[in-house]
Amino acid sequence: MSKVILTTEVSGLGSPGDVVEVKNGFSRNYLVPQGFAVIWSRGGEKQIEQIKAARAAREHATIEEAQDLKSRLEAKIVKLTVKAGQGGRLFGSVKTSDIAKAVEESGIGQVDKRKIEIPNPIKGTGNHEATIRLRDDIVATISLQVVAAK
């Protein structure tokens, strides 16, 4: 058995910075060559403590940024201009990429289209809602105003 320090998330073993004990072949043939871990040493453990402290500080900063973005998203109505036919029926539907682009153009900030969830397909003009999962614990609900292009 050999001790290694994980440098990335490895399912079943742990998160970056964890010191784990694995079989020699697993560490020598898989973890170390793939860059998932480094061989344990006293100096390496001190370095890992510094990395964990820096990661905790970054984590705190990203939480504050996400809270700020959430308040800006919920305070403003995002306007989407799309092609529509008679009666306000859209040609197609509004996609998450359209919402992400509209949020960025409105000056609120950048949002990843994969984090946007639309509860019901948007196939008509009017007011709608969508949720954006900024982090696992921070979810913003945005108001959308879908308008027909002229």
Curated annotation (Swiss-Prot):
GO terms for molecular function: rRNA binding; structural constituent of ribosome. Pfam families: Ribosomal_L9_C, Ribosomal_L9_N. Keywords: Ribonucleoprotein, Ribosomal protein, RNA-binding, rRNA-binding. Gene3D superfamilies: Ribosomal protein L9, C-terminal domain, Ribosomal protein L9, N-terminal domain. This is Large ribosomal subunit protein bL9. Signal peptide: none annotated. It comes from Clavibacter sepedonicus (Clavibacter michiganensis subsp. sepedonicus). GO terms for cellular component: ribonucleoprotein complex; ribosome. Binds to the 23S rRNA. GO terms for biological process: translation. Belongs to the bacterial ribosomal protein bL9 family. It comes from the Bacteria. The keyword RNA-binding applies.
